[in-house]
Design a protein with these regions (language model features):
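A short, flexible low-complexity segment enriched in Lys/Arg and Gly/Pro that occurs
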Residues: 4-24, 70, 187-194, 226-237, ...
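Alpha-helix capping/hinge segments and adjacent helical runs
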Residues: 247-259, 272, 287-291
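Conserved, mostly hydrophobic/aromatic
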Residues: 40, 220, 286
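Small/polar glycine-rich anion-binding or flexible loop at a beta-alpha turn
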Residues: 95, 213-217, 253, 258-265
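Short, hydrophobic/aliphatic alpha-helical segments
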Residues: 15-35, 198-201, 236-250, 279
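FAD-binding subdomain of flavoenzyme oxidoreductases
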Residues: 1-90, 291
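C-terminal substrate-recognition/cap domain of FAD-linked oxidoreductases
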Residues: 54, 63-238, 245, 249
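Activity-critical C-terminal alpha-helical subdomain
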Residues: 14, 263-300
């Protein structure tokens, strides 16, 4: 699914339509992406025009266990580097696998770093690509490779992945989950993932982890009691270190969740040279600063 256009209400009340119904366009500035990335600071999006993808002839899923996170990440890197057509590559670390297994009462599955694959295409092409991914996984010490094409069986294979958030939240009575959101070049994921686990241990924090390895994004899901200020302070310090490490490794402070209120200081580190231009755009469209004031950056 691709967003091809928007209807936006501007701060002065004007209504504009961005994008086009055509498959591609080079007409003018890409206002669609500008408003999507503005986090509501430039206007109110009232309509979204979507270009839907056709449902694949066949969808297949697979899982594979690995002795180390390095093995799992290397497998994902090689699958991408070899150009294997794949829809999704998700990763759970050892801690998250153990949490999911306990929460969902899963059987015949190990609490070790695990990759979850999804393939879209014809049945013949999916079968061929599964064989290739299985071989790559085995070359990286992967084991217990399983795959399925039936929807019910696919959901069973991915059950540990689907229950990630609720399994972590259930660790603490009335607890909450703080999610990190760094994204890196795929070649640098291993170093950052290992760093995250090492720093979590130093802080005495549990660090269940889910990664969208196909695009270099991963989240450390940190459970905490909202009444425990000391733990929350440790989590914020941990996140600070992780973000700075990601920037050091040519990554970004947020792959999906956005800047909002709490990552403004890190945006200064990542895009200091670009912020004056962002402010210029903001002032030209929203002179009275009425659209999400204080989000992304402070005007003054």
């Amino acid at each position: 699914t691709v967003i091809s256009g928007l209807t936006v209400v501007l701060p002065n009340g004007d209504i504009i339509n961005t994008g086009s119904r055509t498959k591609k366009t080079s007409a003018g500035y890409n206002l669609t992406n500008l408003f999507i990335g503005s986090e509501g600071t430039l206007g109110i999006i009232t309509e979204v025009q979507l270009r839907l993808s056709p449902i694949p002839e066949s969808i297949m899923s697979a899982v594979c266990h690995f002795p180390t996170l390095e093995n799992a990440v290397q497998t994902a890197q090689q699958v991408i580097q070899y150009g294997v057509p794949i829809a999704r590559i998700e990763m759970l670390n050892k801690d998250q696998m153990g949490i999911s297994i306990n929460y969902s009462k899963l059987k015949d599955i190990e609490a070790v770093p695990t990759l979850f694959f999804e393939f879209h295409g014809s049945e013949a092409s999916n079968n061929e690509n599964i064989k290739i991914v299985e071989e790559i996984s085995k070359d990286n010490n992967g084991s217990s490779f399983k795959w399925a094409k039936d929807l019910e069986e696919r959901n069973k294979l991915w059950k540990a992945r689907w229950d990630v958030y609720y399994s972590v939240k259930a660790l603490i009575n009335n607890g909450r989950v703080y999610s990190t959101d760094v994204c890196l070049p795929i070649s640098n994921i291993t170093e950052c993932v290992n760093y995250a686990e090492e720093q979590a241990k130093k802080f005495g924090l549990r660090a269940p982890m889910v990664g969208h390895l196909g695009d270099g994004n991963f989240h450390v899901l940190l459970p905490f009691d909202p009444e425990n200020k000391e733990t929350y302070k440790k989590i914020r310090e941990f996140n600070d270190l992780l973000i700075n490490k990601a920037l050091e490794l040519k990554g970004t402070i947020t792959g999906e969740h956005g800047v909002g209120l709490h990552k403004k200081e890190y945006l200064l580190k990542e895009h200091a040279d670009n912020i004056p231009l962002m402010k210029l755009i903001k002032r030209s469209i929203d002179q009275n600063n009425i659209m999400n004031p204080g989000k992304i950056f402070d005007l003054n």
